[in-house]
Amino acid sequence: MERTLVCLILIFLGTVAHKSSPQRPDHLLIRLRHLMDIVEQLKIYENDLDPELLTAPQDVKGQCEHEAFACFQKAKLKPSNTGNNKTFINDLLAQLRRRLPAKRTGNKQRHMAKCPSCDLYEKKTPKEFLERLKWLLQKMIHQHLS
């Protein structure tokens, strides 16, 4: 009887300790929020960006967010030659082009979806490019949390 009671107490304490342990940080969510901050900083310097038109995905379907984000990363967003903040902007752009952490689930579904090529999206000004990128990041955060 005592052994059974001791075993039950140990099992109970083990489950309580397991549930109270901190969860691993969600690297994808942290990275997406960091990207939102980068976009906000780039919007401050949008007058210092090269006015070249850029491919900016819009109305991205549910399984194509990562591919659309890759289109944003491939765009030739760069500082203008006349800007005073060229080094700072280049640092922000380098952070923007870093790869996203892998998702834990749903990778198989994402690869089965037919996503449009980057060339099929409209070209927009840097201001609208940043607005659409911000919208996509918000959508990715919302979908990741749900």
From Swiss-Prot:
SUPFAM superfamilies: 4-helical cytokines. The keyword Ribonucleoprotein does not apply. Its main location: secreted. GO terms for biological process: cell maturation; cellular response to virus; germinal center B cell differentiation; natural killer cell differentiation; natural killer cell mediated cytotoxicity; positive regulation of B cell proliferation; positive regulation of cell population proliferation; positive regulation of cytokine production. Glycans are attached at residue 85. One of its GO terms (molecular function) is cytokine receptor binding. One of its GO terms (cellular component) is extracellular space. Disulfide bonds join 64-115, 71-118. Belongs to the IL-15/IL-21 family. Cytokine with immunoregulatory activity. May promote the transition between innate and adaptive immunity. Induces the production of IgG(1) and IgG(3) in B-cells. Implicated in the generation and maintenance of T follicular helper (Tfh) cells and the formation of germinal-centers. Together with IL6, control the early generation of Tfh cells and are critical for an effective antibody response to acute viral infection. May play a role in proliferation and maturation of natural killer (NK) cells in synergy with IL15. PANTHER family: INTERLEUKIN-15-RELATED, INTERLEUKIN-21. This is Interleukin-21. It comes from Rattus norvegicus. The lineage of its organism: Eukaryota, Metazoa, Chordata, Craniata, Vertebrata. The gene is Il21.
